[in-house]
């Protein structure tokens, strides 16, 4: 699929000078509220959530090629970002209906690709929960939904970043060894599917195809994959798509995420950057609530900066320019 000049220019605005997308993810809403609630008795206020996003944006966007925010709580943070930093805006409602089967997707009802673009977004990002082994009755709805968003983004000439999170309703714990065994196929088959031209996806935001906590040499406990098996899953991921793809950090520690990127590169994965969220900023949440804004700023300027700087150094030696795709 050939991209328009406008889409290419927009992806340029989200990348660094090497054609790598080193993006900061802070579109968390439900997950962020839960993190904040661990450190205070009353529910987090809108003002608290917005201010924390502003702090992270003010302190860290000078080190990121772009930032992913949500239009519900993230617009003040968008205004506060470094002027060289590109903007992705999330289009999906946070979370999913736990009482309904299928984790069906849902857009923010007050927003459209046109409105996100008018808000200054260089790209639209949408998160989809997808299980290639789910019933076709469920999956056909998801495919049609993504086709709609893809067509909307073509109409507005704005890049479409699709984030795919895999799951299995029969394995409730996606951090378990049981899920680790099925994860590679689920991740790579979903990537292959949504790389089809009919979806008009420009960049895939994906999980790494293995749970690194079960890779030989990365764990003291149970081993699900040898190093060579894990490396093969990364090679299969590379073969699954012709599109640029970037990795999400999935809430793992900064250190493990950086080690994972090195492993992916050494295995032969030509990934094109990251959208890294909690691995960079999560430690600021507790500090912000317990010690206030100034202490949180100090954390972001020291530990937060170190996390993002270390990540950028790793990306320089591991990621590949999306322009090579």
UniProtKB/Swiss-Prot annotation:
Record EC number: 4.1.2.40
A Pfam entry, by short name: DeoC
SS bonds (residue pairs): none
GO MF, any single term: tagatose-bisphosphate aldolase activity
Catalytic reaction list: D-tagatofuranose 1,6-bisphosphate = D-glyceraldehyde 3-phosphate + dihydroxyacetone phosphate
Transmembrane parts of this sequence: none
Class of this enzyme: lyase
Single Gene Ontology BP annotation: lactose catabolic process via tagatose-6-phosphate
Pathway assigned to this chain's UniProt record: Carbohydrate metabolism; D-tagatose 6-phosphate degradation; D-glyceraldehyde 3-phosphate and glycerone phosphate from D-tagatose 6-phosphate: step 2/2
Keyword entries, A-Z: Lactose metabolism, Lyase
NCBIfam families tied to this protein: lacD (TIGR01232), PRK04161.1 (NF003180), PRK12399.1 (NF009065), PRK12858.1 (NF009498)
Family, as annotated: Belongs to the aldolase LacD family.
Name of the protein this chain belongs to: Tagatose 1,6-diphosphate aldolase
Species annotation: Staphylococcus haemolyticus (strain JCSC1435)
